């Protein structure tokens, strides 16, 4: 389920984040930039008690601040005896440190104690592997020069391969780990035809045209495009897919918030 599809400063949709549900448990990837994540979960019919795993790609506000609210919601559920087990949180050291420090500074002493007791923190390193929510996952640094960030390659119980490149263009260092995905998830800040207006490259982002090129060079079978501007929502699906299709002949999905994609 795609909880949000927008870039940092969107107001007409939520920031990019999603949940992968393989029937074992649910993995949330990022949480957007505020307590709107609670609204998105409610609209998607996902109870906080059903979120057992959370992976954070990096510590930018539009990805990590929503995680503070997820953590607080878990604490609240624990106090109501409505959350079993622990919330498993994954990320590289910096993003884990940022999340933990914000929670320490903003939670009551009692709530932060519950947070510490009922979370399992897993600090990831480049190339490490984990079994999470039924998936075999390999995490990798995207080699960002802006903010340390990780993506992943996951294999579902059904054998489908999902590659998430984070919210920056592909770095050639990750070409091998990103090859031949059944589903490639990549950002596109805007259409290439509107690059002069939005200046995506200055923000370490790319365009729908670039997303199509990336999917083609990586031999992906399906492409999901997200982390976009929100000025073109009524026409976004058609326009972005058409531009990406100039270079990519596979299946292209440009989801709206709360859309579900069957992997």
Residue ranges and their predicted role:
Residues 6-8, 89, 95-96, 228-233:
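Short histidine/acidic/glycine/proline-rich micro-motifs that form metal-
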Residues 29-32, 51-59, 92, 162-168, ...:
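Active-site neighborhood of phospho(di)ester-bond hydrolases with catalytic His/Asp-centered motifs
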